[in-house]
């Protein structure tokens, strides 16, 4: 299926051409394609497929009765197909097949260790390109400068010295820069705002509650406990110095503290009793 046959059969159908055009650059494959296209069954099959694609395209994309969402989905699918076609053309044929043939000729058609370096660099090249297309560009990251772009010409993508592993160095630079930029974006866009919001909520809600608990309950209770401990220690030491017996001092201390507590309760009750008539008389 040559470009002329596509355009003449169904001019309204736009198909990905990058990979197909590149395949015809190989002489043996180009001859086979032309021979296959000349066969009547293949020619009829191509024409039938083009007619079907043209009808579907006219009904879905160009018809006014087609829903807008369907048109958007079809347009996105077309864009993805062209992008995939260019990606396959770049990675498989330009960087893969053409690069291998170029290095094969530059090494006098002789295999050697350069094949290992070429394979390692080729894998790094694929990884680097996929990172750029599916991670760096969608996330709008800067990354490092690309040595090639999808859709660029094949000659400038040839690897002249595979042993230097240029794409391995490029992949290392890309991943390092991407990691640093992602960490920076996560910190500035998520961690810092979340930290500031949490501090604001703490100052507005939690801190007043903890301060109130501290001042109303914890500090007074702590003061009373210290006073009770000091009073117990003083009474115990006095009783111990008088009796010189630990058990007697403990018992005496308990009795003294109990009597002091009872006296305080009586005093508080008397104060409450005296305050009630005063409150009645005021009314």
Curated annotation (Swiss-Prot):
It is a peripheral membrane protein. This is Protein PET10. It comes from the Eukaryota. It comes from Saccharomyces cerevisiae (strain ATCC 204508 / S288c) (Baker's yeast). Present with 2157 molecules/cell in log phase SD medium. It is found in: Lipid droplet; Membrane. One of its GO terms (cellular component) is lipid droplet. GO terms for biological process: aerobic respiration. Keywords: Acetylation, Lipid droplet, Membrane. The gene is PET10. The modification N-acetylserine is found at residue 2.
């Amino acid at each position: 299926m040559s470009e002329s046959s596509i355009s003449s059969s169904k001019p309204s159908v736009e198909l990905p051409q990058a990979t197909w055009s590149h395949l015809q650059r190989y002489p043996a494959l180009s001859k086979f394609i032309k021979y296959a296209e000349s066969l009547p069954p293949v020619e009829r099959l191509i024409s039938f497929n083009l007619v079907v694609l043209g009808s579907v395209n006219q009904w879905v994309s160009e018809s006014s009765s087609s829903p807008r969402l369907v048109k958007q989905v079809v347009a996105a699918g077309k864009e993805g197909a062209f992008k995939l076609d260019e990606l396959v053309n770049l990675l498989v044929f330009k960087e893969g097949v053409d690069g291998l043939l170029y290095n094969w000729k530059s090494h006098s058609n002789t295999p050697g260790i350069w094949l290992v370096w070429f394979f390692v660099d080729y894998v790094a090249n694929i990884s680097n390109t996929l990172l750029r297309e599916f991670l760096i560009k969608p996330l709008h990251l800067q990354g490092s400068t690309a040595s090639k772009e999808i859709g660029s010409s094949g000659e400038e993508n040839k690897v002249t010295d595979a042993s230097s592993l240029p794409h391995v160095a490029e992949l290392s630079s890309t991943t390092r820069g991407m990691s640093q930029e992602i960490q920076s974006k996560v910190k500035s866009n998520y961690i810092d705002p979340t930290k500031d919001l949490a501090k604001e909520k703490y100052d507005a809600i939690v801190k007043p509650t903890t301060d109130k608990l501290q001042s109303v309950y914890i500090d007074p209770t702590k003061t009373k406990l210290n006073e009770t401990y000091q009073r117990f220690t003083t009474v115990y030491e006095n009783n111990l110095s008088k009796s010189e017996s630990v058990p007697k001092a403990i018992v005496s201390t308990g009795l003294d503290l109990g009597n002091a507590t009872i006296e305080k309760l009586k005093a508080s009750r008397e104060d409450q009793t005296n305050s009630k008539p005063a409150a009645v008389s005021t009314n």
